[in-house]
Amino acid sequence: MKTPLRYPGGKSRAVPKLCQWLPENITEYREPFLGGGSMAIEMTKRYPDIPIWVNDLYKPLYLFWLALRDDGDYLYDQLIQLKQRHPDQGSARQLFLDAKEKVNEDDLSYKD
């Protein structure tokens, strides 16, 4: 499985190199800057039985990953419906621009 997100500064191409430096006996993994999640996804494949903690300061991104983890089937169904309601490139682009504007308007940094 690859990350469903393209993320600036992502680690997807660096994962093989990073994994060369992992210690032999890993008992947990913590990812403070989740982003596109490439390294965390790789760790779940390599070490399916260890606890994995992830975090990201950018709330929309963090909430996306929570939704994918906790309710992936529902998220998938919603995305399919969006695609059906916006079948052409122009409509899909406008949906993207509207969503981008909404995200940029709100202060969505996670501050608890």
Place the predicted regions along the sequence by residue:
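S-adenosyl-L-methionine
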Residues: M1-L34, S38-M39, R46-Y47
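Broad hydrophobic/π-residue packing in well-ordered secondary structure
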Residues: Y7, Y29-F33, A40-I41, W65, ...
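Class I S-adenosyl-L-methionine-dependent methyltransferase module
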Residues: K45-R46, I50-D112
